Amino acid sequence: MRVADFSFELPEALIAHYPQPQRSGCRLLSLDGPTGTLTHGIFTDLLDKLAPGDLLVFNNTRVIPARLFGRKASGGKLEVLVERVLDDHRVLAHVKASKAPKPGAELLLGDDENIRATMLARHDTLFELRFDDERDVFTILNAVGHMPLPPYIDRPDEDADRELYQTVYSQRPGAVAAPTAGLHFDEPMLATLQEKGIEMAFVTLHVGAGTFQPVRVDTIEDHIMHSEYAEVPQEVVDAVLACKARGKRVVAVGTTSVRSLESAAKAAENGLIAPFFGDTRIFIYPGYHYQVVDALVTNFHLPESTLIMLVSAFAGYKNTMNAYQQAVAEQYRFFSYGDAMFISRNPRAPQEKVSP
């Protein structure tokens, strides 16, 4: 399968740089997987598309202000993007500098350059850094870090992004990108869903910067997926099994919830799904047989990205590319701060041949 098969033309003007004034005020493009039928609407239409007893699975990760600016003590500006917090004082990070720091190098970080860190070791593309500070990593980042807006949002981060680029139910700090499908849910909508009898469960997947990395191979099967930490606790497993037993749908909110649930399914030695705690490199592309997820709430993704491949595996390649073509024609807003889709799984998708 060629990566180029997942390309589409996207006018720059359709990339959303700011969210809608009201979280649930975005548009919703619904795609019926089995038939390919498209329906245009608004996000709150989701209330009518879900039935009592359906299970919504959210990702409760919280985005950390993971971007730091500074310089090497020896001179030379640099930018640090924390990828993973290892403990109270150590992180793995991407470091952008004219010359990469060597082990033992001292970094001066923050707008006042008053945060000191030491480069301990290099692990492939990531640098292990130790903050030489009494405060823990999260306290330091909250004090001097910048929100790591995606590269396609071409503006500096603003104070408002600390909450806007965050789901209202976020609880577990550790992500460097938001699980953006969840940004559309506000407190009133969550309350209405509960009143309607929609069940809810929460997984954790700390989204890494790798989610924005382009696929650098020509053939999909050659791509090596980045690693992210995920947790699917026993209560989520129980909720999924109970939902299936009552004949209702498991609805994943976002591709990170999909990847968490399907990782837990792959880990199950007996039965449909088992608790999962650890790193996942699951790469879902056409031909994949979904085990758990019946429907999906997701935003519009980048051309040739692993996420549009995941959606194509779920809805079918032709259905997905047609939906994206229609979304562009109807001027939907794309990417993290953009509009949403609601997709039901196409059971014939794994057998479909990918051909533009």
Curated annotation (Swiss-Prot):
Function: Transfers and isomerizes the ribose moiety from AdoMet to the 7-aminomethyl group of 7-deazaguanine (preQ1-tRNA) to give epoxyqueuosine (oQ-tRNA).
Gene name linked to the record: queA
GO cellular component annotations of the record: cytoplasm
Any one GO BP annotation for this protein: queuosine biosynthetic process
Origin species: Yersinia pseudotuberculosis serotype O:3 (strain YPIII)
EC number: 2.4.99.17
Homology family: Belongs to the QueA family.
Keyword check for DNA damage: no
InterPro entries documented for this protein: QueA (IPR003699), QueA_dom1 (IPR042118), QueA_dom2 (IPR042119), QueA_sf (IPR036100)
Protein name per Swiss-Prot or TrEMBL: S-adenosylmethionine:tRNA ribosyltransferase-isomerase
Subcellular location: Cytoplasm
Reactions accelerated catalytically: 7-aminomethyl-7-carbaguanosine(34) in tRNA + S-adenosyl-L-methionine = epoxyqueuosine(34) in tRNA + adenine + L-methionine + 2 H(+)
Keyword Lipid biosynthesis assigned: no
Signal peptide: none
Enzyme class: transferase
